[in-house]
């Protein structure tokens, strides 16, 4: 049902990951919808288009807008100045504790 709703609204399903849908045009800008079970992440480079997609979905489905993305699937997210930062610090901490490696030396890993 959600798949049909997105396809009817001109979203395209990613051939690489069937849980990712994209839509791009001069009118809407770039929109991305990621589905994980019953959770959605909706990203857009244009606030008006983001609100239109949320309105369209909320007329067809019961949904709750949780605002800006902060936590998803064990990852922490922060947004500022056109940048999205993702961290798995809590998960890494659990792994380090599990293998008694709390004192190991860290290294930064940039992501392009």
Predicted regions and their residues:
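Long, low-complexity, charge-biased intrinsically disordered regions
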Residues: 1-112
